[in-house]
Swiss-Prot record:
Gene designation per UniProt: laaA
Source organism of this protein record: Pseudomonas azotoformans
GO BP annotations, alphabetical order: proteolysis
Keywords linked to the UniProt accession: Hydrolase
Subunit organization: Monomer.
InterPro entries: AB_hydrolase_1, AB_hydrolase_fold, AB_hydrolase_sf, Peptidase_S33, Pro_imino_pep
Reactions listed under catalytic activity: (S)-piperazine-2-carboxamide + H2O = (S)-piperazine-2-carboxylate + NH4(+); L-prolinamide + H2O = L-proline + NH4(+)
Protein name, entry field: L-amino acid amidase
A Pfam family recorded for this sequence: Abhydrolase_1
């Protein structure tokens, strides 16, 4: 029987603002739903749209656009200090309550989404059943250090061009943008040309970079925003649910970047996609979805016993 998607869109009131969300599948199916947290901060749900495929397994999938982005309320005049990890944690909890799933849910956070998901999971919410940090940093200083290492391995002149414009602050110079794209094509998304949903997200960031610039910076690898010193290392052992770490062989989230997840979380496993960079859900879509579904089916079963720290 062919799977027919049941799709519902709506808005969750978040104080004076609105959080747009979409549910693919049936929240009343009895199977643990998966909440997908997009990256950035400042991106949109579009580029992680592929995770809707998971709904065919019976796990409903919730996408949402974080405040300031996509179809949610935009606040371009807010001071950079407004945009905090705490704000986005509150928004996530508000969405879980709005959808009435706070007693039973799993989280998949991609890139920054995994950072936010880590902060959420560290607090040990009672309804969280599983956590999937996909291509996510654990320490921004390590992230930047690894990005600098990867930059130096790019074709001749690219790193020097990036460095020249970063020193001058000329981030909108066409030469800088072109050099940045070389890095992105190697370590962010290796599907060329970029799929429409990926291009749509980057276009949305360009149209309103408020959150991205405030918290991250002008590019993936030049982090000068409020997250520049963020880290979850030393705190990840508090995560007490089954965890699946996802990354790509060519990922800017290198093995060194994701290693603390593997070292600190008691019940953890790692899926490394050999033909992917930062977006295995796009670059190896079928294999990635299969891995996620297999994990959810295993650990969200009533028979599963969570591994504890020894």
């Amino acid at each position: 029987m062919e799977f027919i998607e049941k799709i519902r869109e709506g808005y969750a009131a978040f104080g004076a603002y609105q959080t747009w969300y979409r549910v693919t599948g049936d929240l009343s199916s009895g199977r643990t739903p998966l909440v997908v947290i997009h990256g950035g901060p400042g991106c949109t749900h579009d580029y992680v749209d592929a995770f809707k495929d998971v709904a065919a397994s019976g796990h409903a999938v919730i996408h949402y656009d974080q405040l300031g982005n996509g179809r949610s309320t935009h606040l371009p005049d807010k001071d950079p200090s407004f945009w905090t990890v705490g704000l986005f944690l509150e928004e996530l909890n508000n969405l879980l309550d709005h959808l009435q799933i706070s007693d039973n849910y799993a989280i998949l956070g991609q890139s920054w989404g995994g950072m936010l998901g880590s902060e959420h999971a560290i607090l040990q919410p009672k309804g969280l059943r599983a956590f999937i940090p996909a291509n996510s940093p654990t320490c921004m200083r390590t992230w930047v250090s690894e990005a600098n290492r990867l930059r130096k391995l790019l074709p001749e002149g690219v790193h020097e061009t990036l460095l020249k414009h970063e020193t001058a602050g000329t981030y909108q110079d066409p030469e800088y943008l072109a050099a940045s794209r070389v890095f992105y094509d190697h370590h962010v998304c290796r599907v060329i040309p970029w799929p429409e949903e990926v291009a749509r997200t980057f276009a949305a960031v360009d149209a309103d970079p408020t959150v991205y610039h405030a918290m991250s910076g002008p590019t993936e690898f030049h982090v000068i925003g409020s997250l520049k010193d963020w880290k979850s290392t030393g705190r990840l052992s508090a995560i007490n649910v089954p965890t699946l770490v996802i990354s790509g062989r060519h990922d800017e989230a290198t093995p060194l970047v994701v290693k603390p997840f593997l070292d600190e979380i008691a019940d953890v496993r790692w899926a490394l996609f050999e033909d992917s960079s930062h977006m295995p859900h796009v670059e190896e879509r079928q294999a990635c979805m299969g891995t996620v579904v297999k994990f959810l089916d295993e650990v969200c079963s009533a028979k599963y016993k969570v591994l504890k720290a020894s």
